[in-house]
Amino acid sequence: MKILALNSSPRADGVSKTAILLDAMVKGMREGGADVEMIPLRKKSVKNCIGCYTCWTKTPGTCVHNDDMTRELFPKWLESDIVVYATPLYHYTVNARMKVFIERTLPAWEPFLNRVDGRTHHPIRQKPPKAVVLSVAGFPESSVFSFLSSYVNMLFGKGLLAEIYRPASEIIALPVFQDKAKGILTAAAQGGLELVQSMKISKQTIDQITAPIVEDFDAFANMANSFWNTCIQEGLTPSEFQKKFG
């Protein structure tokens, strides 16, 4: 089984909670025997779709842009059995880098209009891979992912194998929460293993990955607000805060 794991976080490894959770999941996939390639999209040149439809007319199936998407990423996407779309939650949906990647898969479809089950679709030129969506957010409520979930279900339909949404994700990197973080990451690895073995992730495993961490919202909010006030007063970004105070 060939799996492409895309990480659209702009943050470097070790800082990115998207990467931390994805790394654990990929570990399980590899234990299950999958051939997994991880790609940090922040290191790739992927231009915006310009809506020219060259990929539908002049060069069917090939984008007008000669960039990393056309030369490398799109062919790998087409060759994959499963693609994991790992993105931080920005303004309640995928971040801009992931959205650009998704838009650039347009050459896999043809321009014509078909209606299936009451919905209009473009016919598939090249069958897209199955999808898994992984996202993390700072807010503690799972409800913050509702818009993203609606979007990816519309986008991938029956090709969506699993959705993994981790609220209060900053906590998994804090030493005081390491016992809970270990359980979450162990479950993420189990989810990767299950995906390879059965093309799905059990509800029990997803519940373990996404289990509530925050038991006292006021304490959680006070901790977060104290952190941000210190950053503002000291004139530090979060990464600079970490380097200074550990």
Task: Describe each PLM feature range.
Residues 97, 110-161:
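Short, glycine-/small-residue-rich phosphate/pyrophosphate-handling segment
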Residues 177-180:
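Post-His helix in hydrolase/transferase enzymes
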Residues 33-35, 128, 168:
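A generic structural signal for alpha->beta connector loops
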Residues 8, 41, 135-138, 166:
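Cofactor-binding loop segments of dinucleotide-utilizing enzymes, especially the Rossmann-like FAD-
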